[in-house]
């Protein structure tokens, strides 16, 4: 794969954020590229890394033909982890998903693990290992994207994955999913740190306007979230920046070493919260001994602009408003947010009629890192008590 070499970067304490890199060519061999402004990641290295990377697919009541396309597009070497929060009654959409996955396995013999987010075996496992952050007042796993991601990460850790990548199940272009996974691998191969995150910036998000396709560059929520993340950085460096372009990147990946030391927020705030947390915790040289290896190696965040456009399911205006509120809430409640930044966020949310005059954004609910969870014990409890766990080739 040929990519623009990362030239400009923003350094915030131990965190390095690389400027967005465009994919120039999807597939290359080992020949050297005699140009310093281009990075060459040979296909052999990418394919070697894919076997060490689990792809997590959180889903909830998605169209089955979209799910089918996404699964078929994930490179064969990658273990697939499906965490579904779909209906199990009236109608039982989860059963339909299981049937689809069984058929997919029979055709491909891909490595797949599948589980339902509300499986009582999961709740029991979390309770017994003392990780109650993910449970609601009734002792069940909460419904939320962040919760599904944590379940996926633990399953990935249980099978020994060194890298994890997330892809959404509502993608209309299966070929783009194949690219996303290879983009993740390219990002990891460019990194010099064991603590690395790769976030994707879609080249375009096409919309149907007046009967034709309009290839829009930015999503509505992304544009606003990125603006405030950049302000958060700028107010502490005293230099204006536009470095962050992936604040709401649902398609992102990280090394397991990074994933297991990070707390995660619930719902749609999860992706911007990842950035906010890294800036808060590793943006200053404080309490270094707790994470000495992390501070020594540094954290690298790569942003890669995809070759493919991104078509996904339109979930309506209310969904957009909720995403915007929860995304900006993470920045508003950050320890790094200044009073002037908070005021700008409040004005923006009120202008969009998302908050009333005297309201504040809700404080995000944050779940502890998974590092201290005894993974073998957790997995054994899940296997012994699960109603929905399926394992193929794993």
Swiss-Prot record:
EC number: 2.4.1.217
Reported function: Transfers a mannosyl group from GDP-mannose to phosphoglycerate to form mannosyl-3-phosphoglycerate (MPG).
Recorded catalytic activity of this chain's protein: (2R)-3-phosphoglycerate + GDP-alpha-D-mannose = 2-O-(alpha-D-mannosyl)-3-phosphoglycerate + GDP + H(+)
Gene Ontology annotations of biological process type: mannosylglycerate biosynthetic process
Keywords: Cytoplasm, Glycosyltransferase, Transferase
Pathways per UniProt: Carbohydrate biosynthesis; 2-(alpha-D-mannosyl)-D-glycerate biosynthesis; 2-(alpha-D-mannosyl)-D-glycerate from GDP-alpha-D-mannose (MPG route): step 1/2
Main location: cytoplasm
Gene name of the record: mngA
GO CC annotations on file: cytoplasm
Localization per Swiss-Prot or TrEMBL: Cytoplasm
A GO MF term: mannosyl-3-phosphoglycerate synthase activity
Protein name (record): Mannosyl-3-phosphoglycerate synthase
Highest taxon listed in the record's lineage: Archaea
């Amino acid at each position: 794969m040929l990519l623009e070499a990362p030239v400009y970067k923003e350094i915030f304490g131990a965190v390095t954020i690389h400027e967005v890199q465009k994919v120039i060519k999807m597939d290359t061999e080992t020949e050297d590229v005699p140009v310093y402004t281009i990075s060459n990641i040979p296909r052999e290295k990418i394919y070697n890394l894919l076997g060490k990377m689990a792809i997590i697919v959180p889903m909830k009541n998605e169209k089955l033909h979209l799910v089918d396309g996404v699964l078929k597009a994930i490179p064969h070497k990658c273990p697939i982890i499906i965490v579904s929060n779909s209906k199990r009654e009236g109608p039982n959409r989860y059963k339909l998903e299981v049937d689809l996955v069984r058929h997919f396995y029979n055709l491909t013999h891909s490595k797949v693990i599948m589980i339902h987010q509300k499986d009582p075996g999961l709740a029991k496992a979390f309770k017994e290992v003392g990780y109650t952050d993910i449970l609601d007042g009734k002792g069940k796993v909460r419904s939320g994207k962040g919760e599904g991601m944590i379940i996926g990460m633990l399953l990935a850790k249980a099978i020994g994955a060194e890298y994890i990548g997330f892809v959404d199940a509502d993608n209309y272009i299966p070929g783009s999913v194949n690219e996303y996974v290879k983009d993740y691998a390219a990002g990891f191969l460019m990194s010099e740190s064991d603590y690395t995150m790769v976030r994707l910036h879609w080249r375009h998000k096409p919309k149907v306007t007046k009967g034709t396709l309009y290839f829009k560059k930015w999503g509505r929520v992304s544009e606003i979230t990125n603006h405030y993340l950049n302000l958060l950085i700028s107010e502490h460096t005293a230099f204006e920046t536009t470095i962050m372009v992936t604040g709401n990147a649902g398609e992102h990946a990280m090394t397991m070493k990074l994933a297991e030391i990070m707390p995660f927020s619930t719902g749609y705030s999860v992706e911007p919260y990842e950035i906010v947390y890294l800036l808060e915790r590793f943006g200053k040289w404080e309490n270094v001994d707790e994470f000495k290896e992390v501070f020594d190696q540094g954290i690298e965040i790569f942003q890669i602009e995809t070759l493919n456009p991104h078509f996904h399911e339109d979930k309506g205006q209310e969904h957009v408003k909720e995403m915007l509120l929860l995304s900006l809430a993470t920045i508003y409640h950050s320890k790094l947010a200044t009073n002037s930044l908070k005021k700008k966020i409040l004005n923006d949310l009120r202008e969009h009629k998302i908050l009333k005059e005297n309201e504040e954004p809700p404080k995000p609910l944050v779940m502890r890192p998974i590092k201290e969870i005894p993974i073998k014990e957790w997995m054994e409890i899940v296997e012994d008590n699960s109603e929905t766990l399926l394992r193929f080739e794993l």
